[in-house]
């Protein structure tokens, strides 16, 4: 039978562990503020033409960065919605980019077939590690980040987005 002292010690340890979990949980999986855009700018990306590509040219825009693959059904399903939202926010300095973690030939064929209206880049084999660095520890797809004008992550979502969710995320980024 445990003594009163042992019970109090166990309660104290449990309380300390719970407190640590509450304090640390929001930080796990999310990189320090500002490091996301640096990781994205430093990523080895190529355009659909096979040439190296960089995201530096999009500095004045709210940036929506969507990681996807042709073999990912939720990714494929959300692309038409992303194109529609992009069209409705284009005049408000919002730019979309897609980063495919896939084989170049499949992405080129798919992007042509769907007539994807925003820039599409290819990540090399380090693409999954890049999404982990950007706050997606599971490496799952689709994964979307919204960067505000100050280049901070305004929103992130693992999983497919609806048009309404994307509009809410963009409205919040535009308001900040």
Model-assigned labels for residue ranges:
Residues 1-42:
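N-terminal targeting signals for export/organelle localization
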Residues 40-41, 63, 141-142:
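Short loop/turn microsegments at loop-to-beta-strand junctions
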Residues 43, 67-68, 110, 118:
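Conserved hydrophobic/aromatic "anchor" residues
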Residues 44-50, 125-128:
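Short gly/ser/thr-rich secondary-structure transition/capping motifs
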Residues 55-72:
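Short active-site neighborhood of thiol/selenol oxidoreductases, capturing the structured segment around
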Residues 58-61, 91, 117:
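Active-site acidic short loop of glycosyltransferases
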Residues 76-115, 125-131:
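Structural microenvironment flanking redox-active thiols in thiol-disulfide oxidoreductases
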Residues 112-116, 125-171:
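Thiol/disulfide oxidoreductase modules built on the thioredoxin-like
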């Amino acid at each position: 039978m445990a003594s009163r002292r042992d019970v109090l010690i166990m309660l104290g340890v449990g309380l300390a562990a719970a407190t640590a979990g509450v304090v640390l949980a929001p930080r796990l999986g999310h990189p320090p503020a500002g490091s996301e855009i640096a990781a994205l700018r430093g990523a080895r990306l190529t355009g659909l033409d096979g040439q190296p590509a960089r995201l530096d040219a999009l500095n004045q825009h709210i940036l929506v960065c969507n990681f996807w693959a042709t073999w990912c059904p939720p990714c494929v399903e959300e692309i038409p919605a992303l194109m529609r939202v992009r069209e409705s926010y284009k005049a408000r300095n919002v730019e979309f980019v897609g980063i495919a973690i896939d084989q170049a030939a499949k992405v080129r064929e798919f992007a042509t077939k769907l007539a994807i209206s925003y820039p599409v880049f290819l990540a090399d084999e380090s693409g999954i590690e890049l999404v982990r660095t950007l706050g997606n520890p599971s490496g799952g797809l689709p994964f979307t980040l919204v960067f505000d004008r100050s280049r901070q992550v305004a929103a992130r979502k693992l999983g497919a987005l609806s048009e309404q969710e994307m509009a809410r995320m963009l409205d919040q980024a535009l308001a900040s």
